[in-house]
C-alpha cells in the first residue's frame, strides 16, 4: 500500500486561539465568519475535533495564516510503509 502510515501517537495541534486573540476575535466571531457553531471552534481549539480540509482553509484565511502555519503534527512519528 502506498502513502503515509500514521501512528496512534500523532496528534494535530493548532494555534487558532492565539491568532484569534491577536485579531481580537471571539470564538463566536470566528464561527460566524466560517459558517460553523461556536462549539465547533471550541472543539477544534481544544483538539477534540479535526476540521475538514475546507474548514481548515477557511479558518486559516480568516486568521490571515496559511494552513501549514496554523496546524501542525505534534509528533514526528509519521513514516512511509
Which residues make up each language-model segment?
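A short, Lys/Arg-rich alpha-helix, primarily the initiator
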Residues: 1-22
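Short, charged recognition helix plus adjacent turn
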Residues: 2-3, 61, 71-81
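Residue-level signal for the short linker/turn that defines the boundary of a DNA-recognition helix
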Residues: 14, 24-25, 51-54
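Alpha-helical residues within the helix-turn-helix
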Residues: 21, 32, 61
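Short alpha-helical DNA-recognition segment
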Residues: 24-43
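DNA major-groove recognition helix of helix-turn-helix/homeodomain DNA-binding modules
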Residues: 54-69
Amino acid at each position: 500500500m502506498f502513502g503515509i502510515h500514521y501512528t496512534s501517537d500523532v496528534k494535530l495541534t493548532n494555534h487558532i486561539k492565539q491568532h484569534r486573540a491577536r485579531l481580537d476575535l471571539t470564538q463566536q466571531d470566528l464561527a460566524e465568519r466560517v459558517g460553523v457553531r461556536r462549539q465547533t471552534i471550541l472543539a477544534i481549539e481544544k483538539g477534540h475535533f479535526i476540521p475538514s480540509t475546507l474548514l481548515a482553509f477557511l479558518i486559516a484565511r480568516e486568521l490571515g495564516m496559511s494552513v501549514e502555519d496554523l496546524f501542525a503534527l505534534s509528533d514526528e512519528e509519521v513514516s512511509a510503509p
